[in-house]
Amino acid sequence: MKPSLPRAWFDLCIIPEHDKVSPRQNTIETKGVLNPVGSNIAPPLNNGVVLIGGPSRHHNWDANDLVSQIRNIIKDDSHTTWTIANSRRTPAGTANLIMNDPILKDKFFQIDDLPLNWIDQKIESCGRIWVTADSVSMIFEALSTKAKVGIIDVPAKRSDRINTIAPNLQKLGWVYHGDATPDIHRPNLNEANRCAMTILKRWPSLMTANSNSSLL
């Protein structure tokens, strides 16, 4: 993320593009937040996951509309085995609506009941991924796979750098959004690997130091 201190004080800054910083030699701009997901293997399209965030500084929340959108996604793609998972930001009322919905309740998993890294593993194993628009990190995790990615609408509080991410991805043709069909040729992101390679190219001594330490 963009540091609170002047960038000139750092050897290197890794900052998401949506933070809109000016180009500098000591700055790598990334598409989204760095994440541990990165797979070149196309997962089966008959596995799907819906990932739910929650209200934030940038987004309001309409639980009834959200549940309606999820229900439509699953009805429209009934041949897919769907899993629904919430996050720690998801309001309890939203979870209750899903658990009382006859179509969704058996597909729903609460984040507090899931093991560590479950979300990352699920993302890498599903060929269809839908994420609520407020969940920027999960959107870019999904885009770091070969899956077909869709964004579920969440009401924005105002137009800002965060809540314009989803519409911008739609314009690029990278995601399903509403009736839009994404471009099948979207890039398979692996920004963590790209940044690591850039760092090693800039400071090759780091690779030597790591090799020496592994021999100890």
Specify the residue positions occupied by each region the protein language model found:
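Leloir-type glycosyltransferase catalytic cores
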Residues: 166-216
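Short, polar loop motifs at secondary-structure junctions
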Residues: 1-5, 14-21, 88-91, 103, ...
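Catalytic binding pocket for nucleotide-activated donors in carbohydrate/polymer assembly enzymes
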Residues: 137-187
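Active-site donor-nucleotide binding/catalytic segment of nucleotide-sugar enzymes
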Residues: 35-92, 112
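Short, charged/polar "capping" segments at the starts of alpha-helices
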Residues: 21-23, 58-60, 89-96, 157-161
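Donor nucleotide-activated moiety binding/catalytic core segment of transferases
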Residues: 99-137
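A nucleotide-sugar donor-handling region in carbohydrate enzymes
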Residues: 7-63, 178-179, 184-193
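Short internal beta-strands
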Residues: 14-15, 81-88, 150-153
